[in-house]
């Protein structure tokens, strides 16, 4: 028999950190653009996800990539995979 490698397709999303108050957890706002069914206008839809941040290294305003994983807590099943863009200091 040959061994087959199973490839897991995990969902990944890119969003902005809107809260980093909790320990080892950040809140990420993910925006997507969809076409309105009836009127055809492009509208922005958004959703917030709680993501695991083991070392508390991501700060407010950072653009991060999150991946779906196993449930870590009641509301947290996403893990931060990488930093896309650091927050700009104004």
Curated annotation (Swiss-Prot):
Report quaternary structure and partners. Answer: Part of the 30S ribosomal subunit.
Q: What molecular function terms (GO) are annotated for this protein?
A: rRNA binding; structural constituent of ribosome
Q: Name one GO cellular component term.
A: cytosolic small ribosomal subunit
Q: Which organism is it from?
A: Methylibium petroleiphilum (strain ATCC BAA-1232 / LMG 22953 / PM1)
Q: Which PANTHER family match?
A: 40S RIBOSOMAL PROTEIN S11 FAMILY MEMBER (PTHR10744), SMALL RIBOSOMAL SUBUNIT PROTEIN US17M (PTHR10744:SF1)
Family, according to the entry, reads as follows:
Belongs to the universal ribosomal protein uS17 family.
Q: Which SUPFAM superfamilies match?
A: Nucleic acid-binding proteins
Purpose of the protein: One of the primary rRNA binding proteins, it binds specifically to the 5'-end of 16S ribosomal RNA.
- The residues forming a coiled coil are none
Q: By its UniProt entry, which InterPro entries does this protein fall under? A: NA-bd_OB-fold (IPR012340), Ribosomal_uS17 (IPR000266), Ribosomal_uS17_bact/chlr (IPR019984), Ribosomal_uS17_CS (IPR019979)
Query: Its GO biological process terms?
Result: translation
Q: Which UniProt keywords apply?
A: Ribonucleoprotein, Ribosomal protein, RNA-binding, rRNA-binding
Name of protein: Small ribosomal subunit protein uS17
């Amino acid at each position: 028999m040959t061994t087959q490698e199973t490839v897991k397709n995990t969902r990944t999303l890119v969003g902005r950190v809107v809260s980093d108050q909790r320990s080892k957890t950040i809140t990420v706002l993910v925006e997507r653009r969809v076409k309105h069914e009836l009127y055809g206008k492009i509208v922005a839809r958004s959703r917030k996800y709680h993501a695991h941040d083991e070392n508390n290294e991501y700060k407010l305003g950072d653009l991060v990539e999150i991946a779906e994983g196993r449930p870590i807590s009641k509301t947290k099943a996403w893990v931060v995979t990488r930093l896309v863009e650091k927050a700009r200091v104004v």
